[in-house]
Amino acid sequence: MTTRYTINPSLRLCTWCLVVGWHEVKDSFLQSESIFSCEGRSIYTKGDRCMIMAQVNEKRIDFYYCHDTKFDNRNIQSWLRNIIKNKILDLANIELPKRLHYWEKEKNLYARQVIIKKMKRRNIWGQCSIYKQIFLPPKIVVFPLELIDEIILHEMSHLKFMHHRKQFWEYFSFLLGRDAKLCKMKESVFFAKYDEMIEFLLK
């Protein structure tokens, strides 16, 4: 599979809203457990044999596999990515509006609407329209909570100032409680380290 990333037990995703766990189990356990259906359970089979099983809960995905699971298989990779992607999208549609509404009440500053959608450019982490709609990309839900809050407060600042001139940065700093320009350095470091992997999971 020609990609920089392979989803396997070395992938560590542990955030404030989502943990991905990996569990190597005996093949007999995997085959017997896969017979039973329950909420949030998915299995990948080859013929009549379960190769890997996923259990998706509120803020956690657990993958169960055996020693001969072929993680470099293209179909298994697609299955794994879809499991993770769908959970991230579900969480984004729940948690990001919830976090925005929290800050709206805290700051007594309200958007007309919050919309969760993928941005056209990767380096755009949020937008505020002239109609006071705030757009947030789903991928940021797995960012650290502090960084999500900075992104949300940045867009809320645009409810007052639709530019990036001095007034905007002063107001953003007021909402944030510290120098907002320092956020850009922190965001750049995180973007360089993690953004490509998250984009891969959500493609």
Predicted feature residues:
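Active-site-proximal or metal-binding-adjacent scaffold patches in catalytic folds
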Residues: 1-150, 159-203
